[in-house]
A protein has these predicted regions:
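C-terminal motif of bacterial Sec signal peptides marking the signal peptidase cleavage site
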Residues: 1-3
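Electrostatic cytochrome c docking/interface patches
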Residues: 6-35, 51, 124
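Sequence context of c-type cytochrome heme-c attachment sites
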Residues: 19, 45, 85-87
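Short pre-active-site segment immediately N-terminal to redox-active cysteine/selenocysteine motifs
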Residues: 28, 36-39, 47, 51, ...
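Gly/Gly-Pro-rich "capping" loops immediately C-terminal to redox-active cysteine motifs
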Residues: 29, 33, 45-73
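Sec-exported extracytoplasmic/periplasmic mature domains
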Residues: 37, 41, 45, 60, ...
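Axial heme c-ligation environment in periplasmic c-type cytochrome domains
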Residues: 51-58, 75-105, 120, 124
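Charged catalytic carboxylate motif
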Residues: 66, 104-107
Length: 124
């Protein structure tokens, strides 16, 4: 990946430092599951496309910093991040800002990690 700096891998937004992830935290992913069912499920499923892209294995394809920035800063990500621009071109819909805190975004990330690691079945 010569020429790709951390900032490109992290996307555009408040998360600028590399995240050190511990094993999946049950309390955190439980909070994330609740947030997902109230703010994300209208547009996202894990196994198939709904309005937005399917989320299955997103934590294996994208860095945690990128996922956090996409959740926290979707408009600017679509304007400035290469991958987010490609997703916009493919799905023809702008991810909306869901007014989540950085702690909420971290819980959502943990929920996605738990689903991707097979620790729970997604709420869809």
């Amino acid at each position: 990946m010569s020429g790709c700096g951390k900032s490109e891998e992290f996307g555009v937004g408040p998360v600028k430092e590399e995240m050190k992830l511990a094993p999946v935290d049950a309390a955190l992913y439980t909070k994330g599951e609740l947030i997902f069912t109230t703010k994300c499920v209208a547009c996202h499923k894990f196994g198939s496309r709904l309005v937005g892209p399917p989320l299955k294995d997103v934590t294996k394809r994208r860095r945690p910093e990128w996922i956090m920035n996409q959740i926290l800063n979707p408009l600017e990500m679509t304007q400035k991040d290469k991958v987010s621009k490609e997703l916009f071109a493919q799905y023809l819909i702008q991810m909306t800002f869901q007014d989540v805190t950085q702690d909420d975004a971290r819980a959502l990330l943990e929920y996605m990690r738990a689903v991707d690691e097979g620790k729970l079945t997604p709420k869809e």
